[in-house]
């Protein structure tokens, strides 16, 4: 991967999208993770620090280290940022785990968090004539590891064509802090949650499988080449198929 060439391509993409929309810049959610850190870094490179706004959106169960890392990144880049705690919004919905009478529901309550955050980002976007820069990567998009009208809701997905392992490589090249690059990836949807635990496979291995699928290799060959059980390959293929709707336009009858 040619990091210099890729950086130029992505910065030009940001400039193009912002220019087409006659926007003043971009706003993005800063989670303290590698994806949002890389997107913020590239946007600053493209637009300058004064045209990038970061929004940190923790809630009462968020890992405090994530907020620290988000602020570390914002300060390193010199961008303005605001902190918008979503705990009270979750309570107003009656979300499980936020009021005493309800248990946390991973599907309903877990997905509510990124949807609230999307609304906040678009508020700041509309208020300041900014575009919302999405932070989902190619591995997540393939696996449907994102919330429809939540973190997948944005004006563009800058790293949507980069696998997670490529995100790591480019982040190192562009100077994203090591403590952000090296920590376990997590969507932060519930306490102790990590991407790889939930996906049941490391990103390093998953990306190799996804690249092989892109090359139209047979599942038996992928299993043999990567020493991955055929059942796991089938599980990944099924997950890709069942989550395609998250990346497709809303269905309209003919």
Curated annotation (Swiss-Prot):
It comes from the Archaea. ATP binds at residues 29-36, 135, 164, 186. CDD domains: NAD_synthase. InterPro entries: NAD/GMP_synthase, NAD_synthase, NH(3)-dep_NAD(+)_synth, Rossmann-like_a/b/a_fold. Pathway: Cofactor biosynthesis; NAD(+) biosynthesis; NAD(+) from deamido-NAD(+) (ammonia route): step 1/1. Deamido-NAD(+) binds at residues 115, 148, 155, 245-246. GO terms for cellular component: cytoplasm. Mg(2+) binds at residues 35, 140. Keywords: ATP-binding, Ligase, Magnesium, Metal-binding, NAD, Nucleotide-binding. Transmembrane segments: none annotated. GO terms for biological process: NAD biosynthetic process. Homodimer. HAMAP family: NadE_ammonia_dep (MF_00193). Belongs to the NAD synthetase family. Catalyzes the ATP-dependent amidation of deamido-NAD to form NAD. Uses ammonia as a nitrogen source. This is NH(3)-dependent NAD(+) synthetase. It comes from Methanococcus aeolicus (strain ATCC BAA-1280 / DSM 17508 / OCM 812 / Nankai-3). The gene is nadE.
């Amino acid at each position: 991967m040619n990091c210099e060439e890729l950086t130029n391509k992505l910065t030009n993409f940001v400039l193009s999208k912002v220019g087409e929309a006659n926007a003043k810049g971009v706003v993005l959610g800063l989670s303290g993770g590698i994806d949002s850190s890389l997107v913020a870094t590239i946007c600053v490179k493209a637009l300058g620090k004064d045209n990038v706004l970061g929004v940190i959106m923790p809630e009462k169960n968020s890992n405090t280290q994530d907020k620290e890392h988000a602020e570390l990144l914002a300060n390193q880049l010199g961008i303005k940022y605001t902190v918008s705690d979503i705990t009270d919004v979750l309570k107003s919905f009656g979300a499980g785990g936020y009021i005493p009478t309800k248990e946390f529901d991973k599907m309903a309550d877990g997905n509510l968090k990124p949807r609230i955050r999307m609304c906040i980002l678009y508020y700041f976007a509309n208020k300041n004539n900014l575009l919302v820069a999405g932070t989902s990567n190619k591995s997540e998009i393939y696996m449907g590891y994102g919330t429809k009208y939540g973190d997948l809701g944005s004006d563009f997905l800058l790293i949507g064509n980069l696998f997670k392992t490529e995100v790591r490589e480019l982040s190192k090249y562009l100077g994203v802090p090591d403590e952000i690059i090296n920590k376990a990836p997590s969507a932060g949807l519930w306490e102790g949650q990590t991407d790889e635990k939930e996906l049941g496979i490391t990103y390093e291995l998953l990306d190799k499988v996804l690249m092989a699928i892109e090359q139209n290799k047979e599942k038996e060959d992928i299993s043999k080449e990567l020493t991955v059980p055929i059942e796991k390959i089938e599980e990944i293929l099924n997950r890709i198929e069942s989550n395609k709707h998250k990346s497709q336009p809303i269905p309209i009858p003919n």
